[in-house]
């Protein structure tokens, strides 16, 4: 099967209605992957910070916005919320990078994903979260399968 490849950056999301491989690289950011097995459609977001503070544009840079927008985008192509499942990745804290108010940004990003998905009654079926290493993930849209590789630190 021929797969279209789509790479998403921080603050982006993508829903694949044709067989695709959606990829991203994560550090403290989190990616939520949604899959509807009845429609065989998947989507992924990649957000940088947990919560929009109501200042400026409500961007998918923020977890609460990115997750809501991803759910809406899946519904816009015919998916039903009750048929969606989620897989979560990222939220690393390399060398305690990005500490804010005693809690690391990666940890806050993880918490907001759990909170919103629970609130929306979307079951989390797999996750690889936290730790100190980055991740590269690839989502096969028609199966919902995610391949993960850890990013190793290299010094020159």
Swiss-Prot record:
Role description: Probably deamidates glutamine residues to glutamate on methyl-accepting chemotaxis receptors (MCPs), playing an important role in chemotaxis.
Q: Which PANTHER family does UniProt cross-reference here?
A: CHEMORECEPTOR GLUTAMINE DEAMIDASE CHED-RELATED
Q: Which Pfam families match?
A: CheD
Q: Matching InterPro entries, A to Z? A: CheD-like_sf (IPR038592), Chemorcpt_Glu_NH3ase_CheD (IPR005659), Cytotoxic_necrot_fac-like_cat (IPR011324)
| GO molecular function terms noted in the UniProt entry | protein-glutamine glutaminase activity
Record-level GO BP terms: chemotaxis
Superkingdom in the source lineage: Bacteria
Keywords of the record, alphabetical order, are: Chemotaxis, Hydrolase
User: What broad taxonomic lineage does this protein's source fall under?
Assistant: Bacteria, Pseudomonadati, Campylobacterota, Epsilonproteobacteria, Campylobacterales
Q: Which gene encodes it?
A: cheD
Name the reaction it catalyses.
Answer: L-glutaminyl-[protein] + H2O = L-glutamyl-[protein] + NH4(+)
Q: Which family does it belong to?
A: Belongs to the CheD family.
Q: Recorded E.C. number(s)?
A: 3.5.1.44
Q: What is this protein called?
A: Probable chemoreceptor glutamine deamidase CheD
